[in-house]
Amino acid sequence: MDYTLTRIDPNGENDRYPLQKQEIVTDPLEQEINKSVYMGKLEHAMHDMVNWGRKNSIWPYNFGLSCCYVEMVTSFTAVHDVARFGAEVLRASPRQADLMVVAGTCFTKMAPVIQRLYDQMLEPKWVISMGACANSGGMYDIYSVVQGVDKFIPVDVYIPGCPPRPEAYMQALMLLQDSIGKERRPLSWVVGDQGVYRANMQSERERKRGERIAVTNLRTPDEI
């Protein structure tokens, strides 16, 4: 089977991604102001219930590319117990999963396969890029490695590290849950706006900037 790789253009109107209209807004709830009190409250309650179910039942697709996958699987052990976040149900088929974790080095031969698997996932679906290699190619700045999986699929959460610890993966799940809780997706094909609205989430680097600048006493790794 021949595979073709399509480069993603976030600003492209006719690009293959997203298949639905997506728009980054400061607060999706601001659109509820122009609605009536009753319908606005009812639709808001329905969105809260649907998003609560989605963010607490994230089913990841079980596949890995490199050493970061080992750290991802470690989070499923009893020591870390990722079942607390509702993400312990590994799926062997992309059609039954709603989360793709690209863990490890993405080679150019594997990129079309990942893109095809992403296309086979049903909406709503999310992507976590785990590790420096998946984020930006890592130390492999060569012709055979894709310099970031966001070159061909959209990414929701980036996990830095080489490799990241299981705790970093669980923190990424919590960040993804916060983002899913603020999303506004169509409740039905006949109910409300058919667009997909995602909140503009603040990066962890910006959120912790003030805390890091205020540090005056640098501790050794043994004291942390």
From Swiss-Prot:
Its EC number is 7.1.1.-. GO terms for molecular function: 4 iron, 4 sulfur cluster binding; iron ion binding; NADH dehydrogenase (ubiquinone) activity; NADH:ubiquinone reductase (non-electrogenic) activity; quinone binding. Its cofactor is [4Fe-4S] cluster. It holds the Pfam family Oxidored_q6. Its main location: membrane. Binds 1 [4Fe-4S] cluster. It catalyses: a quinone + NADH + 5 H(+)(in) = a quinol + NAD(+) + 4 H(+)(out). Keywords: 4Fe-4S, Cell inner membrane, Cell membrane, Iron, Iron-sulfur, Membrane, Metal-binding, NAD, Quinone, Translocase, Transport, Ubiquinone. [4Fe-4S] cluster binds at residues 67-68, 133, 162. Coiled coil: none annotated. It is an enzyme of class 7 (translocase). The keyword Membrane applies. GO terms for cellular component: plasma membrane; respiratory chain complex I. GO terms for biological process: aerobic respiration; electron transport coupled proton transport. Belongs to the complex I 20 kDa subunit family. PANTHER family: NADH DEHYDROGENASE, NADH DEHYDROGENASE [UBIQUINONE] IRON-SULFUR PROTEIN 7, MITOCHONDRIAL. NDH-1 is composed of 13 different subunits. Subunits NuoB, CD, E, F, and G constitute the peripheral sector of the complex. This is NADH-quinone oxidoreductase subunit B. It comes from Enterobacter sp. (strain 638).
